[in-house]
Amino acid sequence: PGNRALLESSLEQGLMDKLQAFLLELGKGFAFVARQQRISTESKDFYIDLVFYNYLLKCFVLIDLKTTELTHQDIGQMDMYVRMYDDLKRGEGDNPTVGILLCEDKDHSVVRYSVLNGSEQLFASRYKLILPSEEELRTELAREAEAIRLAMELGEQEASRGTEE
């Protein structure tokens, strides 16, 4: 069980590294803000995996990466992050915060966008022109997860060969 948690943690760290580089390389206005950024309620701390500011959209983009199956709790948590970020960090001239949930489990990759203010249809259509599509993110996530898993398996095989000799 501990080894499984370590494996998941390594996968998540590797995916965050690749995703951060991928978004910055897109050249579509992404500026890196923070990794594992803490936001707090009166009683609890929460950590957002990746935070960017998109200066073309004039909004924060929050990314939460899951290495397990996506749940309703994950979606609710992202909505809470977006609300809190809008309340605590969003500036006067900024558009609503966008949340992106990325889920990579063994079977498939899932990408969900979260833009809370339902009346922001105009903004939602605009962000789709600048942010990577769900399919682009899903493909990149699946490709990188597979590469990281293969590298980790190769490392395990080499380690077990070293103990046999």
Task: Locate each region found by the language model.
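Charged, terminal alpha-helix-loop-beta segments
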Residues: 1-165
